Amino acid sequence: MRFLLLFFAVTMNATERLPNIVLLLADDLGYGELGCQGNQEIPTPHIDSIAKNGARFTQGYVTAAFCSASRAGLLTGRYQTRFGYEFNPTGRHNEDPEAGLPLSEKTLADVLVDAGYITGIFGKWHLGGTANYNPIRRGFDEFYGFLHEGHYFVPPPYKGVTTWLRRKTLPGGGSGRWTSSDQKLIYSTHMGNTEPDYDADNPILRAGQPVEEPVYLTDAITRESISFIDRNADVPFFLYVPYNAVHSPLQGADAYMKKFNHIKDIQRRIFAAMLANMDDSVGAILEKLRSKNLEENTVIFFLSDNGGPTRELTSSNAPLRDGKGTVYEGGLRVPFLMQWKGKIPKKQTYKNPVISLDLFATSIALAKAQLKRPLDGVNLIPYLTNQNQGVPHQTLYWRLGNRRAIRHGDWKLLSNPKSGEKQTWELYHLTDDISEQKDLSSRHTDKVDELQSKWNQLNSKMISPIWLPKRK
């Protein structure tokens, strides 16, 4: 009888166990990359399998067109402009005491810890570089990675990789492209600036302690993620894996460079090596979940933090206009995938607009967690299981300094002035013009007025930036 009671208790516990949550975040991966997005040049079978076994969102957005602000929205479930987080700390300004996710904001990890989850982050943080903002003080039980905006995958002297770096001036003077005698180091002036000093005062950390990492960083992040799954397979866990791939610096591991010898453009070949490496890493995480019999009790999200910076990396946003840093579709619409085997239909293409804010709302609903503060996202599960046939969002909003946009239904109004330009508004109908080539603002002035009014109404609920960007 005692054995039967124990067996019953264990069985009930397993049945009622909360689902694990795995959030895989690529860095600077454009909408036009991935096999499941229609690009067959660089095979990505493991990432594609998430779409095959679940849902691919054709209109998946993020809350900002660059790294830090986008992550602030993702991890709080609220438009980051609600709490004044609007820009990107870079270089030494990651250490500014005010340049971090406000301590008043609860992260997804904070909420899930209180719901009984073990939480881990392995990769890039970029939500504050000082001790107050360290992930282990923001709800994460474990952290392995770095705090700033970027990091070398392999530090100088760049062993085992081919490295492409930006330079304002080539070694010896001049512009164009310079290649070392062994063909393993390339400098290019095509961007007109020099590669940031990513690793300065930005060590790899385990919790709060610096460690030396001899392994290519994508592989190291994956190693730590797999270890986390191994050690926590018997409890609900939240695994957040913000890869720094395919963010610069461009560094392709030798084994992956060989796979893409057919790509003649060396810049594109390095990018391909980095993306394929990340795909294999995602595959290793998925395989670990399968080997632990966790796949059917694990919700998996995959998305990018913003659109691709095409000139810098070759990261494609096709067929969308422009890319990272802009409020055109190429800056805000990203690869966006979700899997929960046995719970949401597989091979699903979901065509209504969703946004990264929804991952927070979905996750806390699955965790049966409580949060008093209102969220800007929605639980996606009812929409993917046909319990709710409406649209998750009628209106989406963006503000990035003087760049701003609103999407309402199929209409999008935006202002994307370059430095020194005055504020002007452009209007596009996205169903008819996904590439935003036909500005309809002069023909539909009533629609411009309507959307301006809606943007102003939403913006009135936001606050001014609590800190301003600085350059080194």
Per-segment meaning from a language model:
Residues 1-6:
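Sec-dependent signal peptide recognition
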Residues 9-11:
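N-terminal signal peptide c-region/cleavage motif recognized by signal peptidases
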Residues 14-426, 430-472:
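Formylglycine-dependent sulfatase
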